[in-house]
Amino acid sequence: MFNNNNNDKINNTMMSNNPSGQIINLESIDCNSNLSNTTSIKDSNNNNNNNNNNNNNINNNINKINPNIDRKVLDDFNSKSIKIIDNKLNKKNSKKNLYSKEVDDDINKINLNKKIIPNETNSNNSNNNNNNSNNNNNNNNNNNNFNYNNNINSNNNIINNNNNINNNSNNNNNNNNNNSISLYVDTQEKSKKKVNAESLRGPIIFQNFILYTFFLIVIGTAEGTSWAPEIRVANFVPYCVMCVVLLEFNRLHKKPLLRIIFPLYTSNIPFAYMCIFSREARKYVLISLLFFASCLCIFLQSGIPDLRKHIVIFCIIFMINYGCCILFMDWFYIDTTGTKPYRGRILATKIHWGEEATILVSMALLGCIFIVLEKFIKSYARCVAEQHYQIQCLQKEKEKLQTEINISLKKLDLDTPIEKIMDILRSMINTSESENDKKQLIKVIAVLGSNKLYDPDFKFETCTDDAEVYSWLQSMLNREVGYSNVNNNNNMMMIENNNNNTIINNNLIEPTSPNFSKKLTSSDLIPRIRSMPEITDQGIQELIINNFLEWDFPVFQLSEITDGNPLFYMSYFLFSRHKFFEKFKIGIDCFKNFMRKIESGYDSTNPYHNSIHATDVLHNLNYFIEKSFGKFLTDIELFSMILAAIIHDFKHPGVNNHFQINSKSRLALKYNDKSILENYHLHQAFIIMNEPESGILLKLSDSVRKEIRETIIALVLSTDMAKHFNLVGRFKSMANSFPTTTNTQQPSSSSSSSSSTTIPTSTITPTPNSTTSTTTTTTTTTTTTNNNNNNNSNNNSLNNIINNCSSSNGSMGASGADNSNSNNTNNSNSNNQNQCGSSIFLNSNKKDRLLLMKISIKCADISNPSKPWNLYTNWSNRVTSEFYKQGDKEKESNMDVSAFMDRNKPATTKCQINFINIFVAPIYEIWSHHFPQFKLCYQNILSNLSRLEIEQQQQLQLQQQQQQQLQQQQQQQQQIHQQQQQQLHHHQQQQQFQHQQHQQQLQHQHQQQLNNQNQNQNQSNSNNSNSFGLTQSNYLIVV
């Protein structure tokens, strides 16, 4: 039994030692080295008992592969090869006993039912069955024999995949034990594409049919054409029946070899018949030689084994058949009178045996010629096959080299840029001689090896931020941010609290608004539809048209005059302005249904995340598009950005993702704590988009709808604050790879005077007094814009407003904003400013443009600090109010209150300052650097930040004063307390002195009493002694 590695070694050895197609000498194979992994067989005698079986099976399969191999040579080769293999195996079996049950199971699983073509040597197959039934151990050896034979049968495939097997055998050496060995016994077996017997075989049956038909035509035309009138047409029927019977009888044979040999040998029967009846016409010699040559030509195409032997046999049979026909004719044609019923009329010319002998010798010579021709054809075919094989080898080698060249030229580069950087740094370390440089490079590799390349390294232990800021930042990012000063005891307390509060209020899991608890129906929309003002309201017209290109768009005023529906009107305006209704086949009714459902899904009870915030984000995003990069976007990208802004906070429950995770809500479980609310917004919005009455994407093709959906998903998911730093880091890397074209050209006075978006630099001064100037300038520019636009807006319908806006400010072109009208007040500025960030878009691909779109919607979403102070304070108050509502819910659920969300510990200014410094200012700094037309936004941030810092300083001063006052009060109280303590101490001392005096008096009195008692006792004792003495004297006197 051998594994794959051993088979490959034996195959390679045989191929290398057999370049000329000679029989391989197996004694040259070193089984000690090539069969080192063989396992021992349980009973070595079984191998000796099955040598005959091996010989028979090998012979059968070799005959199948190359039927023209000499039988004697094969028998000698088989006997020698089996003996050598058995001897080698016996030596190995005596040294090793590694045959296990696993190997037995694997061997028993080998398929023993593969078909083998039988031939002359199959008579010994019954011996194999007898040996298998006598001893169960022989099953393993028989399995080996069959595998041995099957490998010989499939040696063509093994040769074709020789290189692959050699490469894969080392990998599979430890996994598979294949009990087989492959032998290569001839040059044709050595070739990778061997031409087998089937491909060398001609259409034998068809050629026999042609042969019979030809002589049939000869019979049918001999008498009619008078070239042989003695051949009667009456012979046509018996000859035809004879040929048909032979051809049909040949179809009954199931064995392919018999179906080839049978028609060749049975062709002697029609020949005998034709030879006999063509004797009278003296054409039998021509017919015999023609028939004989035709049969030999067919024989050469038969491809049967031992072709020469069959040619000799056929020649002998044919000559005997011809001689018998001559003898039969000499016996049969003897009737001279025509009266004998069973004899033929005597021949016109008698048979001359010398002439017949000459014909037989000619047939023998013709047979020898065909034998030599067969040998030559075979040698020539072998030579052609070898040349063809060599050509194929060269062709495959050429293709292999060409493939390697193509791979080297067009190799798929699977190395990431960071891997290439690491390789470059490692090579620099290896070539560097300075130890200091090596240490620095190693440090760089360690930094690059981090899995958070685009996230800042928060180290609160090295900065002045407190634990409250850390907790707030952690809740914003939904992950640990590196704060190391958190007490572990607090974490343990949180775990205990979570274990005690396992039941969470269902109100925290399900949305609290009625709009979230059930699906919107038409009846739910009726109150909103009735409460919406008329679309012909002049105030709505003027407000949108005059301010949609202003950064300080009065979104709260729009909400008031639209009765809480600002998103509907702003979306309607932008859809008409960008011609989305025509480009994306959106019906007006479908759009209205869609927008009413979307705006109804924004909970008006949320102080911040409501339709006003969605309108503000939509306006901000459109402002970025029209002021800068709109012309670089495709229609699909522009449409996707507008839709993403509309639905980005759809059905927001008023709490953040951190709350969802801590409360173990249904949404957190559904979305696996990853971008929970963002996924929820998308899911609910796409449900509405798929409804028939509100499906604004249903009329688009599948490919366009798929692209819009993918873009919307990417944009809405990018609004997750947990992805903020990664997104900013990627934008930095991408933007730094493009040259930044900063426009320093100032607009002319005429253009600046007519521009409604030009903001004087005085409005950016970060002082509290700058608000007045900002308001004044904004009012002036707004008034100018109103005057320009009111001259062109005369209709009272929203469609006329849209058309009027398109004519006055320009409509978006096929690729974005294209302000083409000469009355547009922003042309002179926007044309110059659009060049600033154009290099990024001009040199970017679709992936980079998607990153830019993500940054733009991110900036639009957190743009509150970039607004003027009056708008910013309104937004910050709303955010704080929503934070406090979340804190109240956390208290109701016995959860830890998040940072800056406890209304009992207000810290709005501190929260806003940290939000600006950590999130808003860095991204707007990069945004305005690459798009200078947005520097107003960044400088508003700096202005608001300075005011917040002033407020914080004032608050700190107030706190310090209060602390000082409190300290003074505490000091006064401490002094009074000290005085009181001193007085109390003095009083206590007096009391102690008086008490001591009193104790001394008591002790003195007590001592006097003791003395008096002692005196009295002494007196009493003396009196008693005197009385006793008198008593004794009296007694003595009596006595």
UniProtKB/Swiss-Prot annotation:
The chain crosses the membrane at residues 202-222, 227-247, 257-277, 284-304, 311-331, 357-377. Inhibited by 3-isobutyl-1-methylxanthine (IBMX). Residues 533-973 form the PDEase domain. Residues 30-201, 248-256, 305-310, 378-1039 are extracellular. This is 3',5'-cyclic-AMP phosphodiesterase 4. Phosphodiesterase specific for extracellular cAMP. Involved in the degradation of extracellular cAMP specifically during multicellular development. Binds 2 divalent metal cations per subunit. Site 1 may preferentially bind zinc ions, while site 2 has a preference for magnesium and/or manganese ions. Residues 1-29 form the signal peptide. GO terms for cellular component: extracellular region; plasma membrane. Glycans are attached at residues 11, 34, 37, 119, 124, 131, 167, 178, 406, 430, 500, 515, 769, 791, 795, 804, 809, 823, 826, 874, 944, 1018, 1023. A divalent metal cation 1 binds at residues 613, 648-649, 861.
